A protein has these predicted regions:
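Repeat-based blade/solenoid architectures
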Residues: 1-5, 60-76
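Acidic, small-residue rich beta-repeat scaffolds with periodic aromatic anchors
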Residues: 1-13, 104-106, 111-218
Length: 218
């Protein structure tokens, strides 16, 4: 399915595991619309044939602008947070259908075995800041340090951006998936989310900031 963009093999208490990631952006249809998708699957390789543990598929259908669906390679992690030999597999990806430069939908998803899945869903930092020639500085709200509703609303008030929809760029909507999850899962996912957003924010800001002009040489 699509173009393979990642493959990972490891062993844990369940046996030998294979994780495959793929994505694709289609050519435009006759009417100019475009589609895109991401695909991921984890298989157990022990035995005569692979045993599918889970599959992920998400897409953008019939986008009249520019469609996109891409894995964030820094998001892929295999962990053993409980120390019981059972792996948690985390992947993250963005989706968009837009005609301008603006944040993408972003999902960070953790799978454990065949049936457990925990998600953080929000928007990333792509396009969240821009260079203001007159001010000679980057403009836009900074990356929130806390994605609670109160913290996001405080940032909106501070920057006098009342009416801004939540979540803010770089934040997720809620942590409801983790209500009954082991505490280390949410702690890891929170930290991982902000690490990814901080890196993206830094990379984006560097792209927007003009390079210093070289002194004229005589």
């Amino acid at each position: 399915r699509g173009k393979q963009v990642g493959a990972f093999v490891w062993s844990d208490k369940q046996g030998k595991n294979l994780l495959v990631l793929a994505e694709q952006v289609s050519e435009r249809d006759d009417d100019g619309a475009q589609s895109a998708f991401v695909y991921a699957a984890q298989d157990l390789l022990d035995g005569d044939r692979p045993k599918r543990l889970w599959m992920l598929y998400d897409d953008v259908q019939h986008c009249e602008f520019d469609a996109g669906a891409h894995f964030n390679s820094d998001a892929t992690r295999v962990t053993d947070l409980l120390g019981d030999g059972i792996s948690q597999v985390t992947v993250g990806y963005s989706r968009t259908c837009t005609s301008d430069v603006s944040p993408n939908d972003f999902k960070l998803i953790m799978h454990i075995g065949k049936s457990q899945k925990y998600r953080l869903r929000g928007i990333d930092r792509y396009g969240a800041s821009w260079w203001d020639e007159d001010a000679g500085a980057l403009q836009g709200m900074p990356l929130p340090k806390d994605c609670s509703i109160a913290a996001q609303q405080a940032l909106v008030s501070q920057y006098k951006e009342q009416g801004t929809e939540l979540p803010l760029p770089g934040c997720y909507g809620d942590e409801e998936d983790f209500a009954k999850a082991p505490k280390p899962y949410l702690e890891f996912m929170r930290q991982h989310w902000f690490t990814l957003m901080q890196k993206q924010d830094t990379d984006w800001s560097q792209q927007q900031t003009p390079a210093p002009a070289e002194d004229d040489q005589e």
